[in-house]
Amino acid sequence: MLPVQTSNLAAAFTDAVRALAPADATLPAVTFERPKVAAHGDLACNVAMQVARALKSNPRELAQRIVAAVEADARAQGLVAGMDIAGPGFINLRLTPSAKADVLRAVLNEGDHYGARERGVHGQVLVEFVSANPTGPLHVGHGRQAALGDALANLLSWQGWHVHREFYYNDAGVQIQTLALSVQARARGLKPGDASWPEAAYNGDYIADIAADFLAGKTVSASDGEPVTASGNVEDIDSIRKFAVTYLRNEQDIDLQAFGVKFDRYYLESSLYSDGRVDAAVQSLIDKGKTYESEGALWLRTTDDGDDKDRVMKKSDGTYTYFVPDVAYHTTKWERGFTKVINVQGSDHHGTIARVRAGLQGLDIGIPQGYPDYVLHKMVTVMKNGEEVKISKRAGSYVTVRDLIEWSNGGDETIRGCLEQGVADWPAHFTRGRDAVRFFLLSRKADTEFVFDVDLALKQNDENPVYYVQYAHARICSIFESWGGADWESRLAELAGADLSAVTGADASAQALALGRRLAEFPDMLAAAAAELAPHAVAFYLRDLAGDFHAFYNADRVLVDDEAVKRARLALLAATRQVLRNGLAVIGVSAPRRM
């Protein structure tokens, strides 16, 4: 339903229940859902069963009294055609044809804004995602983060938040020093397995590429930094470190550009040390009595905030543990005015959540418990040519985001080749691959493991979910081209005034009504997905919407001789096309007119 329809109907039900309840009773929020069986109606409500025990009433009898009150409520007039009570007390509702027509007209009139809320109604939110160490290319796990984080940011923006996208670079610590030593070893002509090869060094071929460019005196730059020119001096480890980090940040920038992901800010971990923020946070925790010394180390009393044991902050060698700069970093988020923060990270970060939150609580600067929110995702396995693509950290072999985009794009074109040839619009060459990777990585809940099947991503049939959804959009465009010629989009406005009874009234087919119901669910689906930090729900919805469209297409001819019926069905298709476009936009996938 439209938000105003939902609001009016929920208010009518709420008042009906409140009139039957004691004045001090706590009542649940009234919600509506789609009945499992279409013949049962358009909406179902179980509020009678929810409050029956508190009101000491039989739920079915209570449902009858609620129905009687709602039927007499002016807010339900013109909205509800009838209500039935099923089972122990379910209330099934049938909406009026005019209410259904109002939804279609709203889609056509609101266009690209259908389902969106006014910007700023919720304030601002910071979404941190990807946040890969600049020690290697973006792998498929980072790709899942990018798809989840960007779609979540889009979703929150649609729901009225001012969204700030941030990428946190762990450009300090042991891993960065290991990167520098690995490049230095390659620059000296060493290879993995040689006696002098550094312990725990990175073994991937990309290390040799960095070393070659360093020796050649190449210049590289990241999107938010100054160009860095290699000195070529293999003894200058600081120069190697700076060049290697910038080189890999540039490579990650290329991958993100191909993936269609942009950030508002890149925040460097190293700046937290140079600005003194890490030391200041630790000193503040010491001053507030949140730490103690034991076994030569400094410990944080994380058990005070629910952790299973206290955690080391500063090791006996004087270095900080992994979560300490994270505490300092999150204080900057709070100080910048972001009272709502969401971190999208791999499930391997689960252990740091309690530590970071405990550190923030220990600072006692007004940060609420449970800050920040987290969306954790599980691993991705890649299948290609019917076999699992094996990865090995020791050998330095893994599937990158770039690999997935190129493989899913079809053909032999590569991103590196386009860059070397100076192709200006090179990201557009990989739209198909980008769309497939984005949609696939959102097609499961974040907390479930996912198998990315490259062979499936290349299929052009209804087995491929992104093809199935995009083809629905392209098929609708084809119908409109047959109706209105090449300039058909300019004629869509005339459909907003069409008589819609052929797709909303008593003579409408079951498929037309089902499609209309699905379109009506879009705003509420977006709101629920945003509230639950669940962008996968948008991908699920789009597959269902495409299925409803294909069922309608197979049941009802659109371009019939009866002008009124034709215009009504075209209006339904125009609304369907619009919602497909809007939903795909939320998850960052294109809506092609031809396929």
From Swiss-Prot:
One of its GO terms (cellular component) is cytoplasm. Keywords: Aminoacyl-tRNA synthetase, ATP-binding, Cytoplasm, Ligase, Nucleotide-binding, Protein biosynthesis. The keyword Ligase applies. A motif ('HIGH' region) lies at residues 132-142. Coiled coil: none annotated. GO terms for molecular function: arginine-tRNA ligase activity; ATP binding. It catalyses: tRNA(Arg) + L-arginine + ATP = L-arginyl-tRNA(Arg) + AMP + diphosphate. Its EC number is 6.1.1.19. NCBIfam families: argS. This is Arginine--tRNA ligase. It comes from Cupriavidus taiwanensis (strain DSM 17343 / BCRC 17206 / CCUG 44338 / CIP 107171 / LMG 19424 / R1) (Ralstonia taiwanensis (strain LMG 19424)).
